[in-house]
């Protein structure tokens, strides 16, 4: 009687220790994922060999990869991602693992990023992104949108893509766009316009040319600026601009 009891105690303790070690390993993996991600986006890694070694050691997906960025609807709610980082990371990773997709998921104070391979078709990608958005909304109790990057041939391009994704969410906010998710390519025109608008000389020229229009619009409530904005958002298509203004 004593032997089976002792055996059960030892097995129970061993199981607890193994489970504890497993949990510690999972936590360390998450920390290492975050460290590597921020080393890449801050350009602390400059050699392809180092990027290849470190991503392989953490079992990140092989290149080429795609990055999906998730952002909460309003900046004032961005702190929720930090508060629920562990829950968010596990939930997004679980969605990808359920579809047998190798992944790395990193949550920052501003956004949640999912790195994955590019072998899946558009239909499955649509399902996965919508599942990610829905799960993020459930966890944070806040509306969410997503941007899907272009395929990256190597991890050293992560820094540039990260900046483009941040610009994409900034454009969505300032232009009051309503998409739930979008491909980064579709924001190329808006991103170019954003960069042009930051140029001091261009900014002064626009103020000089549009200054009188702004004054006239305010004085007579002609909604000329709203019409101009609709034209810009619809890539100068009068038909689409008219439809958006009518629906608005």
Language model features by range: what are they?
Residues 1-5:
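Interfacial "cap-and-anchor" motif at the non-cytosolic start of specific transmembrane alpha-helices
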Residues 6-248:
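Cytosolic nucleotide-utilizing catalytic cores of signal-transduction proteins
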């Amino acid at each position: 009687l004593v032997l089976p009891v002792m055996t059960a105690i030892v097995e129970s303790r061993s199981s607890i220790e193994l489970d504890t070690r497993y949990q510690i390993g999972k936590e360390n993996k998450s920390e290492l994922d975050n460290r590597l991600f921020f080393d890449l986006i801050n350009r602390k890694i400059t050699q392809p060999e180092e990027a290849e070694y470190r991503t392989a050691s953490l079992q990140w997906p092989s290149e080429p990869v795609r990055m999906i960025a998730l952002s909460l609807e309003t900046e004032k709610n961005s702190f929720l991602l930090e508060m629920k980082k562990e829950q968010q990371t596990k939930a997004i990773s679980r969605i990808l693992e359920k579809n047998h997709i190798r992944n790395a998921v990193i949550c920052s104070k501003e956004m949640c990023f999912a790195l994955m391979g590019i072998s899946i078709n558009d239909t499955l990608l649509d399902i996965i992104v919508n599942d990610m958005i829905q799960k993020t909304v459930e966890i944070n109790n806040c509306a969410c949108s997503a941007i899907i990057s272009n395929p990256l041939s190597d991890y050293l391009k992560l820094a540039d893509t990260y900046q483009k994704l941040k610009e994409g969410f900034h454009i969505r906010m300032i232009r009051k766009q309503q998409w739930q998710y979008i491909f980064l390519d579709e924001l190329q025109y808006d991103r170019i316009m954003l960069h042009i608008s930051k140029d001091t000389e261009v900014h002064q020229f626009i103020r000089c040319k549009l200054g009188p229009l702004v004054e006239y619009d305010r004085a007579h409530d002609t909604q000329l600026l709203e019409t101009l904005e609709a034209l810009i958002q619809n890539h100068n298509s009068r038909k689409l601009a008219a439809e958006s203004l009518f629906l608005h």
